[in-house]
Swiss-Prot record:
Main function: Catalyzes the transfer of an acyl group from acyl-phosphate (acyl-PO(4)) to glycerol-3-phosphate (G3P) to form lysophosphatidic acid (LPA). This enzyme utilizes acyl-phosphate as fatty acyl donor, but not acyl-CoA or acyl-ACP.
UniProtKB keywords: Cell inner membrane, Cell membrane, Lipid biosynthesis, Lipid metabolism, Membrane, Phospholipid biosynthesis, Phospholipid metabolism, Transferase, Transmembrane, Transmembrane helix
GO molecular function: acyl-phosphate glycerol-3-phosphate acyltransferase activity
Pfam family, one: G3P_acyltransf
Pathway participation: Lipid metabolism; phospholipid metabolism
Organism from which the protein derives: Agrobacterium fabrum (strain C58 / ATCC 33970)
GO terms for biological process, alphabetical: phospholipid biosynthetic process
InterPro entries: G3P_acylTferase_PlsY
Catalysed reactions listed for this entry: an acyl phosphate + sn-glycerol 3-phosphate = a 1-acyl-sn-glycero-3-phosphate + phosphate
Protein name per its UniProtKB record: Glycerol-3-phosphate acyltransferase
Assembly and binders: Probably interacts with PlsX.
Record family assignment: Belongs to the PlsY family.
EC number: 2.3.1.275
Length: 205
């Protein structure tokens, strides 16, 4: 009998998976890296976000790439560790809470990023082929429009639909929920896109 088929231990193990996921997700790599590089508080420039796109507005491409990678790995690590310890359902819980940890980190007064990199990392751990599809959609849209936010929003619209068609259903449910939350976190970006005032990739300020 696996740990999560035992009704006496499953709630505690799922709670532990959630805690591990949240703590991993809440590490603010964008803020840490920019401070270590002597660039100050990334929350005081551009969109005020702690993610890779805003780090790119410092002009340091390597730092932005490192932020993207480390933020994504938070989601991947949460999914893979929980899956190895407690199985599939626990991995989805850990991935979800890693995403929430990035969006609402306790260390920063629950004001974090918008979750795109962690979303990618969760996909890498839970549905690797869908992560590749996400990357292709993002890259194609970004190449055409130069809008990071639009690229992510489009990918987060398409990937859940693909998962509902191809399965598995529980992963589709998780990714749909992540997409809805991230779309909500991007509401100001959506307003700026509609107004034609959204910053393009590489644009400072």
């Amino acid at each position: 009998m696996s740990a999560l088929t035992d009704w006496q231990t499953a709630p505690a193990l799922l709670a532990l998976a959630a805690l591990i996921g949240y703590l991993l997700g809440s590490i603010p790599f964008g803020l840490i890296l920019t401070r270590m590089a002597g660039l100050g508080d990334v929350r005081k420039i551009g969109s005020g976000n702690i993610g890779a796109t805003n780090v790119l507005r410092t002009g340091n491409k390597k730092l932005a790439a490192a932020t993207l990678l480390l933020d994504a790995l938070k989601g991947t690590a949460a999914v893979l560790v929980a899956n190895a310890l407690w199985g599939y359902e626990a991995s989805l819980v850990a991935g979800f809470f890693a995403f929430l940890g990035h969006l609402f980190p306790v260390w920063l007064g629950f004001k974090g990023g918008k979750g795109v990199a962690v979303y990618i990392g969760v996909l890498l751990g839970a549905a690797p082929l869908m992560m590749l599809a996400f990357a292709l959609i993002w890259l194609a849209t970004a190449f055409i429009t130069r809008y990071s936010s639009l690229s992510a929003l489009l990918a987060m619209l398409i990937i859940p639909v693909a998962l509902w068609v191809l399965g598995p259903e529980k992963t589709a449910m998780l990714v749909t929920l992540l997409s809805v939350i991230s779309w909500w976190k991007h509401r100001e970006n959506i307003r700026r896109l509609m107004a034609g005032t959204e910053s393009r990739i590489g644009q400072k300020g």
